[in-house]
Each structure stands twice: as C-alpha cells, then as structure tokens.
Regions:
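Repeated loop/turn-to-beta-strand initiation elements of outer-membrane beta-barrel proteins
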Residues: 23, 62-65, 109, 195-198, ...
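Extracellular loop and loop/strand-boundary signature of outer-membrane beta-barrel proteins
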Residues: 35-41, 83-94, 108, 169-174, ...
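Residues on the lipid-exposed face of transmembrane beta-strands in outer-membrane beta-barrel proteins
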Residues: 27-31, 53-57, 99-105, 123-127, ...
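Short glycine/proline- and aromatic-enriched beta-strand/turn motifs that initiate or cap beta-hairpins
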Residues: 20-58, 132, 261-265, 269-273, ...
Length: 299
C-alpha cells in the first residue's frame, strides 16, 4: 500500500508540474482591419485598435494548442476606398473566440537559452459576433458623429426576409450576426527569459457571411424596404448614392465574395507555474528523487 501511495504521489507531482509548466497565459494588442465590398484589396487600410487574451498549451517543442478571446473594430468608407459616389460607410465591433493549432518551424520553448526563437504557422476554427452601424452625413458630406449610430442589420437594407414578388423572386434571408470563422496566419515568437515569451503575428479570418459590412447584393425598391421593416431609415441607409437614387436591381455589392477581417499585433505570454518545464527533465527527476528520499525517511 505504501509503494502504491508513493507511486501515485510521484505521478501526481510530475503530471501537475508538467501540465502547469506547459501552459502559458497572456495578452494580445494590435490592430484589426476588414476586406470586403467597401474595401476590396486594401491590406491594413483603416486599421483600428484590437486587444485580447491568449492561452497556449505546449504539446511539444514544435506543436501547441491555443485559445484566443479577441476584440477589435473594423471599418471602411467609400470616400477612402475609391468609390465615393456609392457613399457607403460602416463600423462594427468584432468579438472572436477561437481554438487554434500552432506549429513551430524550429525547436522552441519558453525559458530555453538555445531554442529561444522560432517562426510559426497557426490555424483553427472559431465564432465571432458583429453588428454593423454607420453615421449619417452632414451637408459637407462628412460623417456626423453627433447624430448617433444607426445600426444596419435591423434595417434589412437589401430586403432581407421580405416576401417574394414578381419583380424580386427571391430576397436574401436575414443574416445572423454570430458566425463561424476560420483564422489562419503566421508569426514569430521569442523567449525573453525563463517565464515570458513575446510573439508577433498576423492572421486573416475567413468568414461565412457577406454582411459584415451590410453590403452584398442589389439595390431594392424603397417602398419594399419600408414595408419590410416599417423603419424610415431603411431606404435612406440602403441608398446613399451621391449621384441620385439607384435603379432597383442595380448592383450594390458582390454577393459572390465573402467578407474577411484580420488581427495583427503582438502577444506577451507568461508560463504558468515555476521551474524549467519542458526544458529540463533532469530538474523534474531531481524533484522526484527528493520526494523519494523524504518518503524513505518517513518509513
């Protein structure tokens, strides 16, 4: 019985110590931007602040699992993106939770003197929430922030959910502001000392919606929009063109392409628990020997 107790004690100590020292907890700070109908190709265009929290579990010196909770604002404006006559604008806070796998190109672990740097790739799956909104423009065609935010999803600016008719055989469905996302990217990580690790990374997010910016398909008859929502802002926010009202059925966006967003920035993580962790199994063996000697003194 004493031998069994001793074995369980050794196993529990080594397991808890190893698990703790393989774990890292930290923060993310950087920026977020979006690619879609209002910004088709401008990488890092109109970047806004982003931040969050990171948990990493190092499976080996090459592989790790990671959980992220990130938040940031994405925005785009036709006046900046090259189509000022359409005159659309949006902003949205993006909140993301994801699980990712990391693969280090080189042997790496926090606290190592010889393996303190590695490029890495990451990819995974997650969910995110968004809720696009805009401002009206004043007589100088500037966004009037004093007038307050106008949230766009509830306005159904492309007739989402409206009943079919002869002119419009099929309207898009009402879009969900909680969606799946596929994050992937690359980065570099540096071991600062026995406890802290610094990372620099850039990740793209493939979404499964074309309404992150509330723009996807075609202009709709204003009367249908008003009847569909009962909100007079619906036709006003749907067609803000500088060159006059657009003919219903005219292209407003590109529904064949999904929207993307991106987080880029730095991470600072700290290894949970003290000791050398994966880097030094000899130290763990010495600790086990200490427990063994203490056990024999108790006999």
């Amino acid at each position: 019985m004493k031998k069994l107790t001793f074995c369980v004690l050794i196993w529990a100590f080594l397991s808890s110590s190893a698990l703790a020292q393989r774990s890292e907890l930290g923060v993310f700070a950087g920026g977020a931007f979006y690619l879609g109908d209002l910004n088709p190709s401008g990488l890092f265009s109109q970047t806004q602040p982003a931040f969050g929290a990171v948990y990493r579990f190092n499976l080996t010196t090459r592989w790790a699992l990671r959980a992220n909770v990130l938040t940031g604002v994405v925005t785009a404006d036709d006046a900046i993106s090259g189509t000022p006559e359409r005159n659309l604008h949006f902003r949205s806070r993006v909140n993301e939770f994801s699980i990712q796998a990391e693969i280090n190109f080189l042997t790496y672990f926090t606290g190592s003197q010889n393996h303190r740097f590695s490029p890495f790739l990451f990819g995974g799956v997650g969910v995110f929430t968004f809720d696009p909104w805009t401002y009206i423009r004043n007589s100088y065609n500037n966004l009037d922030r004093n007038a307050g935010r106008i949230y766009l999803a509830q306005l159904r600016t492309e007739g989402q959910g409206a009943p079919e008719n002869d002119d419009y055989p099929a309207f898009p469905g009402v879009y969900n502001t909680t969606q799946l996302v596929i994050p992937f990217g690359f980065g570099f990580k540096f071991s600062l000392n026995r406890t802290f690790s610094l990372g620099v990374e850039w990740g793209m997010r493939l979404t499964f919606t074309d309404y992150l910016d509330d723009v996807s398909g075609f202009y709709v008859n204003p009367g249908i929009l008003l009847e569909n929502t009962g909100n007079p802002n619906s036709p006003i926010m749907a067609d803000r063109s500088l060159n006059g009202p657009q003919v219903p059925g005219t292209q407003r966006g590109n529904r064949n392409l999904r929207d993307w967003y991106s987080f880029a920035g730095i991470t600072l993580t700290a290894r949970i628990g003290s000791g050398p962790g994966m880097a030094c199994p000899a130290m763990q063996q010495r600790r086990a020997d200490q427990i063994r000697r203490h056990y024999h003194r108790m006999r």
